[in-house]
Amino acid sequence: MVTIGMNYFVIPGKEKVFEDACANVIETMGGIDGHEESSLYRQVGEGEPVYLISSLWAEEEAFKDFIASDAFKKVTNWGKLNILRGRPTHTTYKHD
């Protein structure tokens, strides 16, 4: 098992659009082989909107297949053009 933390920096005023898009993506991810669960979190307090999607995967390879998919690329390209302040970053946490 691995947990992937994906960090997103959202353009101020685009939070609702981002949250709605993430809800759809997380719902779609439910049908992907190797995906266990995902949750969306938002930074609290002042400052620019920052989000984290935490995803649990059966194995890291399943996550890599997902981010290499055309569907993922389409969503991230749309996000870069419309709602994100930069490229998302991710961190992998491996379970023993």
Feature-to-residue mapping (PLM):
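Glycine-rich beta-strand-turn "strand-cap" elements at beta-sheet edges
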Residues: V2, S39-G47, T76-D96
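An amphipathic, aromatic/His-enriched active-site/gating alpha helix that lines ligand/cofactor pockets
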Residues: E27-E36, L56-H90
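Active-site-flanking beta-strand signature of metal-NTP-handling nucleotidyl enzymes
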Residues: V2-Y8
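Short, surface-exposed ligand-recognition loops at beta-strand->loop->(often short) alpha-helix junctions
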Residues: V10-V17
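Short hydrophobic/aromatic beta-strand micro-patches
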Residues: F9, Y41, S54-L56
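Short, glycine- and small/hydrophobic-rich beta-strand elements in well-ordered beta-sheets
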Residues: I26-L52
